[in-house]
């Protein structure tokens, strides 16, 4: 039980190249927390968090090119990785074995996200389409067309109603999953949308852009609730805390920032990375944050709860 933000652990030389994506998983055998990292060294690594440190469990081989996105299923036992090799791979977190490989087509699968029911996997594409694959079958089931530019980021709302996509031209689209219809187009940013995240109650959407700003949108009314500045450069990743009180952001300014959602202010800045920070995530109970970056390090931070 911590009363302040602090760095708990640094895993140096975690990969042999930049680490662009990170997630938390769970080992259902012993209940231990896992950290999953995806790197431009073509590897996905699974780390066990125990005794306040990370121990590598597996280095998962299979991708032919850099791994740019990883996501853990809400059920917690399956992990997906997408790579510049245009393949999505599904992995069993219990055994470290590959479940299947999905050919995402002639376009590279940039970001990958599980649906809240763990049944589907969404990935953005070059041609402005979000492709939805069945987790069980590995087959493409349908597409959502933004009729826009290359999609860099995607997110499902936790209630399963919406899917949001962020494009290289700064346009955000929100789809109704049940009907496949495009509900809202948000034009608040002028530069690429690197990341977006829904609040746990699905009411808010937070977006991160190369323009250096973070925006908070009211999902239902598609209205801009706040614009936050503080990072000195591109904002590369955003993620909500499980209780919706905070969200965390990472940037090419080498910092990780924690924001108070209701006060719309930054409450803490971590300056522990030596290079741009590509990935950041809260664990399932909000007690810890993990971050990864170009410095090939994984950092775990303690949060007051």
UniProtKB/Swiss-Prot annotation:
Cross-referenced InterPro entries: Beta-prop_EML-like_2nd (IPR055442), G-protein_beta_WD-40_rep (IPR020472), SKI8 (IPR051510), WD40/YVTN_repeat-like_dom_sf (IPR015943), WD40_repeat_CS (IPR019775), WD40_repeat_dom_sf (IPR036322), WD40_rpt (IPR001680)
WD repeat extents: 14-57, 62-101, 104-143, 146-187, 188-227, 230-269, 272-305
Coiled-coil annotated spans: none
Main localisation: nucleus
Lipid metabolism in keyword set: no
One Gene Ontology term, aspect cellular component: Ski complex
An individual GO BP term: transcription elongation by RNA polymerase II
UniProt-listed SMART domains: WD40
Keyword Repeat: yes
Keywords: Cytoplasm, Nucleus, Repeat, WD repeat
Localization annotation: Nucleus; Cytoplasm
Subunit structure: Component of the PAF1 complex. Component of the SKI complex.
Role summary: Component of the PAF1 complex (PAF1C) which has multiple functions during transcription by RNA polymerase II and is implicated in regulation of development and maintenance of embryonic stem cell pluripotency. PAF1C associates with RNA polymerase II through interaction with POLR2A CTD non-phosphorylated and 'Ser-2'- and 'Ser-5'-phosphorylated forms and is involved in transcriptional elongation, acting both independently and synergistically with TCEA1 and in cooperation with the DSIF complex and HTATSF1.
Family the UniProt entry places it in: Belongs to the SKI8 family.
Name of the protein this chain belongs to: Superkiller complex protein 8
Native source organism of the sequence: Xenopus laevis (African clawed frog)
């Amino acid at each position: 039980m911590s009363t302040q933000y602090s760095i708990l652990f640094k895993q140096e030389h975690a990969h042999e190249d930049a680490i662009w994506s990170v997630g938390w998983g769970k080992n259902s055998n012993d209940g231990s927390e896992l950290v999953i990292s995806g790197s431009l060294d073509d590897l996905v690594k699974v780390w066990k968090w125990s005794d306040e440190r990370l121990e590598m469990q597996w280095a998962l081989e299979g991708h032919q090119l850099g791994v740019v996105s990883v996501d853990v299923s809400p059920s917690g036992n399956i992990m997906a990785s997408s790579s510049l090799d245009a393949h999505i791979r599904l992995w069993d977190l219990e055994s470290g074995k590959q479940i299947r490989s999905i050919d995402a087509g002639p376009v590279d699968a940039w970001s990958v996200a599980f649906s809240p029911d763990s049944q589907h996997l969404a990935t953005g594409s070059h041609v402005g389409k979000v492709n939805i694959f069945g987790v069980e079958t590995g087959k493409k089931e349908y597409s959502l067309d933004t009729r826009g530019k290359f999609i860099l980021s995607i997110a499902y709302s936790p209630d399963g109603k919406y899917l949001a996509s962020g494009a290289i031209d700064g346009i955000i689209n929100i789809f109704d999953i049940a009907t496949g219809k495009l509900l809202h187009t948000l034009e608040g940013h002028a530069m690429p949308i690197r990341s977006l995240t829904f609040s746990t109650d699905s009411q808010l959407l937070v977006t991160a852009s190369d323009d250096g700003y973070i925006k908070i949108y009211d999902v239902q009314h598609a209205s801009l609730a706040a614009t936050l500045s503080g990072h000195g450069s591109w904002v590369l990743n955003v993620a909500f805390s499980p209780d919706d009180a905070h969200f965390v952001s990472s940037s090419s300014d080498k910092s990780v920032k924690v924001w108070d959602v209701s006060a719309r202010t930054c409450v803490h800045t971590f300056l522990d990375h030596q290079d741009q920070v590509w990935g950041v995530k809260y664990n399932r109970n909000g007690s810890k944050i993990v971050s990864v970056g170009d410095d090939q390090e994984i950092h775990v931070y303690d949060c007051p709860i």
